[in-house]
């Protein structure tokens, strides 16, 4: 910290009194440690008394139950810093706002500290959000920025937390931050230098209360001086129309899989073309970008546009993307034999993500199923009826998907796996899928559903898919 405690409290008056941290989980621990290191008085509220006791021993903070905070009142506090998992309708947060107390998130707090130069000169914030593709785009952009020579790092929901990133030595100058709608909801003053909104589809509606609120929270990144948005997505276009940018602000930069107009980045004749930060500048070939298919290409276009806005050359972008390796469970090729490929896209936990995953292949043996959480599946199946040749289904909502497949793609082979043991279920699905696949086919795990009905997470689901592929996709 480059300022004294007294100077900090002048720069950020909300930290001059006692700070109430909502949540003693991973995020709450990180924020409490940060605040205590800066000399702030902190009380942490959580219903888990064991976690509170542990945190109090670690940091010396005071602790309290959420119910006691609400009953005692908020007169002792100057601000609430909430963990992103706490919903806006949580009684403590509702009561705090009703009492006139500001509620902010962990990212917003760190942003204010950075703008106040508490940890040295202000950093460059490049924020990536969207329903799908955030992690891949963030990783791509961080790779490009690092290749350009910038002291950049992927932070936020991948890499290190933003709280750690502003204190890391050697210093990180460019924060390429993947942020969720939860984090953006509680960010009232965050205006990144570059903001990217990839896409929007139904997600986390139970947390936000409505799709409109979810979309508005995501679209906060478009307040950035350099705003970049996926113009092929109808919901994104609705938000770009709704947002009133400053009169002197540059127009929003669009990226598209089609022909780019002026002020856009897109694809022409198999090449990524920049018509926003150059005059028809060829960035690289669209072929060979990982992950394969429209999703990976969209991610690369968004990352390239953001890098170009920072003055990065086309040569640097081409070199960085050529060596980029996709993270696990996001379109990773986990097997290849006799012109059959196996693709792990376990991260495709909703129909929108599965749409992009399936679109990258002309003939697919589809492995799907899990918790649909009420998501509509018919449109996805109708869209890809011409490329799906067989379907293996597992998980709690497999019958819903099976009914849709039999309605919209009658006659294709369908396996419904009733086994509930996660490893045996995946093994059965994969063994059958391999038996259905022929040269030129892709066996694609793109569940279109959440994983927690059977697996500890989408990572375990993808790992078990890869293990089963290794056992069955061979001579």
Swiss-Prot record:
HAMAP family: MurD (MF_00639). The keyword Cell cycle applies. Its EC number is 6.3.2.9. PANTHER family: UDP-N-ACETYLMURAMOYLALANINE--D-GLUTAMATE LIGASE. It catalyses: UDP-N-acetyl-alpha-D-muramoyl-L-alanine + D-glutamate + ATP = UDP-N-acetyl-alpha-D-muramoyl-L-alanyl-D-glutamate + ADP + phosphate + H(+). ATP binds at residues 130-136. This is UDP-N-acetylmuramoylalanine--D-glutamate ligase. The keyword Phosphoprotein does not apply. Keywords: ATP-binding, Cell cycle, Cell division, Cell shape, Cell wall biogenesis/degradation, Cytoplasm, Ligase, Nucleotide-binding, Peptidoglycan synthesis. Belongs to the MurCDEF family. The lineage of its organism: Bacteria, Bacillati, Actinomycetota, Actinomycetes, Mycobacteriales.
């Amino acid at each position: 910290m480059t300022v004294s405690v007294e100077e900090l409290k002048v720069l950020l008056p909300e930290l001059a009194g006692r700070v109430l941290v909502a949540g003693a989980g991973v995020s709450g621990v990180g924020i409490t440690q940060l605040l205590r290191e800066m000399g702030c008085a902190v009380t942490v509220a959580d219903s888990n008394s064991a976690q509170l006791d542990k945190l109090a021993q670690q940091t010396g903070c005071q602790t309290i139950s959420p119910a006691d905070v609400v009953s005692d009142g908020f007169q002792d506090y100057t601000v609430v810093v909430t963990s992103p998992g706490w919903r806006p309708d949580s009684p403590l947060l509702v009561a705090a706002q009703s009492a006139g107390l500001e509620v902010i998130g962990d990212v917003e707090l760190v942003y204010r500290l950075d703008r106040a130069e508490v940890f040295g000169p202000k950093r460059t914030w490049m924020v990536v959000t969207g329903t799908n593709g955030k992690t891949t785009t963030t990783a791509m952009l961080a790779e490009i920025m690092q290749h350009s020579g910038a002291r950049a790092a992927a932070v936020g929901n991948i890499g290190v937390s933003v709280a750690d990133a502003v204190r890391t030595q050697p210093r990180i100058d460019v924060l390429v931050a993947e942020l969720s709608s939860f984090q953006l909801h509680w960010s009232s003053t965050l205006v990144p230098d570059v903001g990217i909104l990839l896409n929007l589809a139904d997600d986390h509606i139970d947390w936000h209360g409505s799709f409109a609120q979810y979309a508005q929270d995501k679209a906060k990144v478009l307040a950035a001086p350099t705003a970049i948005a996926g113009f092929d997505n109808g919901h994104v276009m609705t938000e770009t129309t709704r947002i009133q940018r400053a009169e002197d602000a540059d127009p929003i930069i669009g990226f598209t899989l089609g022909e780019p107009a002026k002020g856009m980045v897109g694809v022409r004749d198999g090449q990524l073309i920049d018509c926003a930060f150059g005059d028809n500048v060829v960035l690289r070939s669209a072929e060979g970008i990982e992950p394969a298919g429209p999703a990976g290409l969209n991610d690369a276009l968004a990352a390239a546009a953001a890098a170009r806005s920072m003055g990065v050359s086309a040569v640097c972008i081409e070199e960085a993307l050529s060596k980029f390796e996709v993270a696990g469970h996001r379109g990773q090729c986990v097997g290849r034999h006799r012109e059959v490929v196996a693709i792990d896209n376990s991260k495709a936990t909703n129909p929108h993500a599965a749409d992009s995953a399936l679109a990258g292949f002309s003939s697919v043996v589809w492995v799907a199923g899990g918790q649909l959480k009420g998501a509509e599946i018919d449109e996805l199946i109708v869209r890809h009826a011409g490329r799906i040749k067989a379907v293996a289904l597992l998980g709690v909502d497999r019958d819903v998907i099976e009914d849709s497949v039999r309605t919209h793609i009658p006659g294709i082979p369908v396996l419904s796996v009733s086994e509930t043991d996660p490893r045996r279920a995946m093994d059965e699905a994969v063994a059958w899928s391999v038996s259905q696949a022929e040269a030129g086919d892709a066996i694609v795990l793109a569940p279109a559903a959440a994983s927690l009905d059977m697996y500890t997470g989408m990572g375990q689901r993808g790992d078990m898919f890869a293990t089963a592929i290794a056992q069955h996709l061979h001579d």
